[in-house]
Amino acid sequence: MGSAEGSKLAINKMLIFQVIGIIALLSIPSLLYTGSYIISEAPAPKEGIEQAPSSEERLSEGLLFIVLDGGRKDMMRDSNFMPNLNSMVDENGTFIDVLTGPLTMTASCVKEMATGIPSRPKEGLSNFHPEHPGTPDGWTLASSYDGDGDGIADNEFAIVGDYVWGDLYADNDEINFMKHRHGHSDYMKGDIESFETLNSWFDGEIPKSNTKEDVTFERLPNVIVAHLSGLDSTGHRYGTTDSPEYEEKLRWLDEKFTEVFAKVPENWTVVLTADHGLTESGQHGSSDAVIREVGAWAWGPHIKKSHTVEQIDQRDLATLPSLLLSLPLPHATHGKFPLDALDISDEEKQELNQWNWNATVMRNQWMEDNGHNYVEGLSSEVIEWEKISPEKMGL
């Protein structure tokens, strides 16, 4: 090799390294942003609530919120598998299409339904033991809010079933958590125990807490979250479509719920949903449509009959305690009321929509004040939901 060729090769190598160096430098901001996004939580105000328009007039006197872990929408909606559940909404209630976030892990889905705050990738690292962000949410307020000032919370909140919800609110001794989950191969035992606890409550009995032995709960709950995970375990083991085991589990759940539903007071609202769906082989975690698209079956006072609501975001379900029980609406909740499900006057809908929007405007203001992404020009005078998107709200 001549000296000229050697010099040319050296120059080419130098140019290559320079290009690589420039690309690396240009990538640093993106890598820092992406890394921060992955390991951090979505920004949300740790305080701030919007009072209900009328705390004395509530849409419901109680709320039974049921989550079937790993419930496929198409199979749950099939009356061959869950005839009793579907008859409740086909005749007396509303079916709602629900879209989960892209991270379809149990903890991330539960956290969105509970807090209304969108999940970040870090939630996947703590799939079975989510951490509460420390923000106000409707379920926390259901356990503690004393609107009439008599020194006693207006509602009594209890959780039964899987430990995911219990772990999320582990630091709240006002919540009676009855844990009924015995590992990932628990196809039946935990669900059987959960139904026993549910029936006890509706029969007027209060079993001793099996997670807070030093706390005595004397009031029957009128706000209940029941998270049953046996269906998810069954799907993981046996698959879903064309799986006799998964199909039989759906039928068993449908029969057990029929007994419970008959005991729910008429002035309560019942909402049954799934945290995520499952693929044919029983998997979840990805953003496949069959996993993200779940359903919600709802009935009770002021709920439309024989009605279907177009798709809502899963975190919209976090607004239900505030909406139905006239609890304050936290500014931190990234949720929109599913008003189309309600059988109320247009004037009442407008009032509730304004309440919801006011909380959104306050959250947007907090985003701006604290250096996060926000939407310019929002005001309480003009309701502009179309301007709100995850990309523009600091997610």
Model-derived regions: residue spans:
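Active-site-proximal alpha/beta segments of enzymes that process anionic O-linked groups
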Residues: A24-P29, I39, P43-G48, S55-F65, ...
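Short coil-to-beta-strand
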Residues: E218-D232, R292
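Catalytic metal-binding/acid-base residues of hydrolase active sites
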Residues: G71-R72, S229-L231, H276-L278, H302
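A long, amphipathic alpha-helix that forms part
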Residues: E5, I11-V19, Q51-L59, M188-T216, ...
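Structural motif
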Residues: F65-V67, V223-H227, V271
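Membrane-interface soluble catalytic domains
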Residues: G2-L59, T135-G138, D162-A170, E247, ...
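Structural scaffold positions in well-ordered secondary structure
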Residues: D69, M88, M113, A226, ...
